[in-house]
From Swiss-Prot:
Family statement drawn from the similarity comment of this UniProt entry: In the N-terminal section; belongs to the precorrin methyltransferase family.
Active site residues of this protein: 72, 76, 98
Modified residues (N-methylglycine): 398, 402
Domain of life: Eukaryota
Quaternary data: Homodimer.
Precursor leader, as annotated region: 379-392
Region (Clasp domain): 252-378
Pathway(s) where this gene product acts: Mycotoxin biosynthesis
Name of this chain's protein: Methyltransferase/ribosomally synthesized cyclic peptide gymnopeptides precursor gymMA1
Residues modified to N-methylalanine: 400
Origin species: Gymnopus fusipes
Keyword Transferase among UniProt keywords: yes
Length: 420
């Protein structure tokens, strides 16, 4: 066994092909597939398989290690090992697994861990999972009101807790208690055990959305709104397959803690949240979703302000050269160029004569802030507060609507802007 501190020839990169055929392979993943010495893949549709073969002629199908009645764990160990053998031979190996390569995938995690322990460079790149597709197709946001996700058999075996006030996602509901593999439909004879647990937690009439993400680009996803009791019907249960996922909406809403909100200074001592206000859109799958209009008083007040909107003084518009854009694009999509840059950032940056001095300095420094300052037009007021590298301290805020943004809505009487 080689020491984990040694630098070995050979590397392993694990990528995901997404769920929908071809289209969900990221640019980052594709660049590694094309540059690999050899590609090992486990994908579910032949179009993606053919696409991989077109991008790299040296491909091996890992699906050959499955067999009827064969324990899936044996298959996973073998999948990992055939990739590792080639890494040990000094090759740059890419493993492609459908969906997100680290979500409900054992051989990818095993291979990465072993490769790292033996001193090889190993990395996993993110991909699009069935859960990502579910969020998009069902129109739910895991942050509101939170989300719990379990593998169905593990949920039963370890008696995992349920939070009935959050989203609940169950994976692999079509193979309850199944440890081996079959090339045909799984025998889901223990499905009733799952329904018993769900009925105990939610009641027989609670909604369950049976979901299967679309694989082909011209398909629609399977979205069946059912109840737990309806799933006990034999014909309905037959629709559930090895690629099915269940989404169970919240049974109840949870009120915010006034004490915590005041400790976080989100509310003044004399303020209380307006419990009649709900963020739009509400959860269409919930059994008792409130009727919320898209343009209530709060929304109308915000929209009125658009009429007087001006760009803030501290807004930072893009202001970069084509040369800088081209170099950063290549660093993102060309693994070999990225390796060259990481080996000697100074030499790489100084050789890029088409860049401005500021752009070369930022590329040499290599930090997010340095690049942002070189590629954005920074207001002079930002220079009032700088870091050790004489770069402005800038807060970058995304568009995520978190619990704070959703919860901290006070009474309409406290709004300073009104709708005429």
């Amino acid at each position: 066994m080689q020491s984990s501190t040694q630098k070995q020839a050979g590397s392993l990169t694990i990528v995901g092909s997404g769920i929908e055929s071809i289209s969900q392979i990221t640019l980052q993943s594709l660049s590694h597939i094309e540059a690999a010495s050899k590609v090992f893949y486990c994908v579910v549709d032949p179009a993606t398989e053919a696409y991989l073969l077109a991008k790299n002629k040296n491909c091996v199908d890992l699906y050959q290690y499955y067999d009827n009645g064969k324990p899936r764990m044996d298959t996973y160990i073998q999948m990992a090992e055939v990739m590792l053998r080639e890494v040990r031979n000094g090759l740059d190996i890419v493993g492609v697994f459908y969906g997100h390569p680290g979500v409900f995938v054992n051989p990818s995690q095993r291979a990465i861990a072993i490769a790292k322990s033996e001193g090889y460079q190993a990395r996993m790149l993110p991909g699009i999972s069935a859960e990502d597709c579910l969020f998009a197709d069902l129109g739910i946001d895991p942050c509101n009101p939170g989300c719990v996700s379990y593998e169905a058999s593990d949920f039963l075996i370890r008696e995992r807790p349920v939070n009935v006030s959050s989203h609940f996602i169950l994976w692999q509901v079509g193979c309850i208690g199944v440890a081996d593999f079959t090339f045909v439909k799984f025998n889901n004879s223990k499905f009733g055990v799952l329904l018993d647990r769900l009925e105990h937690e939610y009641g027989a009439d609670h909604t369950v959305v049976h979901y299967i993400a679309a694989v082909l680009p011209y398909e629609n996803p399977v979205i069946d709104k059912l109840t737990i009791s309806q799933l006990r019907d034999t014909e309905v249960a037959k629709r559930v397959s090895g690629i099915s996922t269940f989404y169970i909406p919240p049974k109840e809403l949870k009120d915010p803690s006034m004490d915590i909100m005041r400790r976080l200074e989100l509310l003044a001592a004399d303020q209380v949240p307006d419990k009649q206000w709900h963020f739009y859109p509400t959860n269409q799958w919930a059994p008792s979703a409130p009727n919320v209009v898209p343009y209530g008083p709060i929304e109308q007040a915000a929209i009125v302000q658009l009429g007087s909107h001006t760009i803030p003084e501290q807004f930072q518009p893009i202001a970069t050269s084509k040369a800088m854009t081209d170099i950063l694009t290549k660093l993102a999509l060309d693994p070999k160029m990225l390796t060259e840059y990481k080996a000697d950032r100074r030499a790489f940056a100084q050789s890029a004569l088409e860049l401005t001095v500021n752009e070369r300095d930022a590329l040499e420094m290599g930090t997010f802030w340095a690049l942002r300052c070189a590629m954005k037009k920074m207001p002079s007021s930002f220079m009032d507060e700088v870091d050790a590298n004489n770069l402005p301290v800038v807060a970058v805020v995304g568009v995520a609507v978190g619990a704070v943004a959703v919860t901290v809505v006070v009474s309409l009487n406290d709004l300073t802007d009104s709708v005429n």
